[in-house]
Amino acid sequence: PVNEVPDNLNTMRIPVSVKDSLILSIDKSPMDMIYFPEDYPKQKMLTPNLANPVARIIYSRPQINKRIIFADSSVLQNVIQRYGQDWRLGANEATEIEFFKQVTINGRKIAPGRYIMYCIPYPDKWNIVFNENLYSWGLHIDKTKDIAEIEIPVIKNDVEIEYFTMLFQSSIYGCDLVMAWGNAKTVLPIHFN
């Protein structure tokens, strides 16, 4: 026999249109995942026994949305991130990076493993920090678990980038992690050992 839902249960439901429910559930800072090599997921589907990638980053991509991205304390409203304060390099969950082999960044060896990656931005430089305090929503930093802090210069972009973006690019020594948002761009060189 087929179990039917009684009519009185159907009338107790709150009517919500599909459009409204989609709008309510859309994350304004969608999560993204990048790999090095860049096309690793496609390669893995074509070659199941392919070796692990070198690196993977999981992060959320906030948008400017008519706000000021970076500012000092003199700007009082509509600021996403203050200069000199810890930033999770995205939104929502802490940005997570995984190295599948040892790499060297600015002369510092980083062992294979998963880390959160955060930033302390300034107008002319970003300090990128790797930390072992995984699984934190937002950015609840235990600075005793910082394993490396690397200073990289800010390059001014001619084009404004609406969504915070990270991508890997091949280089002669390994790869560069390019991070861009608004008119700011940074490049973190990663050497393969």
Task: Kindly give the residue locations of the regions a language model identified.
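Mid-length scaffold segments of soluble, non-membrane domains
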Residues: V79-H140
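Primarily secretory-pathway and cell-envelope proteins
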Residues: P1-Q85, L139-N193
